[in-house]
Curated annotation (Swiss-Prot):
EC number from the UniProt entry: 2.7.4.-
Name the UniProt record assigns to this protein: Protein VTE6, chloroplastic
Further information: Overexpression of VTE6 results in increased phytyl-PP and tocopherol levels in seeds.
Example of a GO biological process term: vitamin E biosynthetic process
Catalytic activity: phytyl phosphate + a ribonucleoside 5'-triphosphate = phytyl diphosphate + a ribonucleoside 5'-diphosphate; phytyl phosphate + CTP = phytyl diphosphate + CDP
Family: Belongs to the TMEM19 family.
Name of the gene this protein is made from: VTE6
Membrane topology of the entry: Multi-pass membrane protein
InterPro entries per the UniProt record, alphabetical: DUF92_TMEM19 (IPR002794)
Alphabetical list of Pfam families matching this protein: DUF92
Protein origin, superkingdom: Eukaryota
Organism expressing this protein natively: Arabidopsis thaliana (Mouse-ear cress)
Function statement: Phytyl-phosphate kinase catalyzing the conversion of phytyl-monophosphate to phytyl-diphosphate. Involved in the activation and reutilization of phytol from chlorophyll degradation in plant metabolism, including tocopherol (vitamin E) biosynthesis. Involved in the biosynthesis of phylloquinone (vitamin K), which is required for the photosystem I (PSI) complex stability.
Length: 333
């Protein structure tokens, strides 16, 4: 494993004050954290040259240097933590959110980012960097699909509000089932026997949601003919409970891709990835039927998109867990 070290020289008229960044061993120089560290170092060093022009500034810089060194040491220790803790989860999440803020603001409102930060912290605490990367992949895919043909969607009145920037209710509605699985994993409910089931439910919930988002957004952008899930009657794009061939295929591919990411990251096995894809399609069909049958109907005004999202991803998680227990487990044996 590589060692990361650097020396930052703060020059003044009185003296040159060396600030030595701590040596961090135990993680690869090619890791995202190492690259981020080097990026920050390269940008700090030029700014430091000539920064100090008086003795008083030099004295202040000495204290600041010592403080910065302590903060950096503690932060990198948390990042390298083998077993995720709440402290390491917050530190890692904060670092990634700062570096990824240009992307985050394109897909989330300010309050949505706050909700996503809580989700990211919980995910890292439960499943470490692998779980976090899975959720990040979901966010990138979903945001990209939402932006497809945005002008056309807005003209037709079927685009997401705020140029597709999701708020806190959308974030919570899209991650509720995953959060439940994460909490159950953190506190080891049911012991080791249930640990992988909760992990499977977590992955399946996001496979379900990414499939739902992509199928909806691509269907609104490219769907040639849109059918109501309950009657197969042709309806306008954007109708609740409507489906299109183009959107359905895109959603299936998105679910397959995210399940493959989960498999690659070691969160699930290949057979479990197949379960996630199948469960996501079953859940999305169920959501379409619910939307077509009840949403926007008299007596069901409470059944808005956020509530339907919770039902959808919960179905995806539950179906995947049941399939694992009653079908896949027996088939593997």
């Amino acid at each position: 494993m590589a060692t990361i070290s650097s020396t930052l020289l703060l020059n003044s008229s009185r003296s040159a004050l060396p600030l030595r960044f701590p040596k961090f061993s135990g993680f690869s120089s090619s890791s995202p954290f190492a690259r981020s560290y080097r990026f920050g170092r390269r940008n700090l060093e030029p700014l430091s040259n000539g920064m100090l022009s008086s003795g008083s500034r030099a004295d202040g810089a000495t204290a600041a240097a010592a403080s910065m060194e302590g903060v950096m040491t503690e932060a990198m220790k948390l990042i390298q933590s083998a077993s995720p803790t709440w402290k390491s989860a917050v530190a890692n999440n904060l670092l990634i959110f700062v570096l990824g803020s240009p992307l985050l603001v394109t897909g989330l409102s300010a309050s949505g980012i706050a909700a996503a930060f809580l989700l990211g912290t919980l995910t890292w605490r439960a499943y470490g960097s692998a779980g976090f990367l899975l959720v990040a992949a979901y966010f990138v895919i979903g945001t990209a699909a939402t932006k497809v043909k945005m002008t056309q969607k807005e003209a037709q009145g079927v685009a997401e509000k705020r140029k597709g920037r999701r708020g806190p209710r959308s974030v919570i509605g899209s991650s509720a089932a995953g959060c439940v699985c994460a909490f159950l994993s953190i506190y080891q409910v049911g012991g080791a026997a249930f640990s992988q089931l909760f992990r499977l439910g977590f992955v399946s919930s996001f496979c379900t949601k990414v499939s739902d988002t992509v199928s909806s957004e691509i269907g609104k952008a490219y769907g040639k003919t849109t059918y109501l899930a309950t009657t197969f009657k042709i309806v306008p794009r954007g109708t609740e409970g409507a489906m299109s061939l183009e959107g359905t295929l895109a959603g299936l591919l998105a679910s397959f891709f995210l399940a493959s990411v989960g498999c690659f990251l070691g969160q699930i096995t290949p057979p479990e990835a197949a379960v996630c894809v199948l469960a996501s399609q079953i859940a999305n069909l169920g959501e379409s039927i619910i939307g077509a049958s009840f949403q926007d109907k008299e007596g069901f005004k409470w059944l808005n998109n956020d509530v339907v999202n919770v039902i959808n991803i919960s179905l995806g998680s539950i179906v995947a867990i049941l399939m694992q227990q009653f079908i896949l487990q027996n088939w593997v044996k």
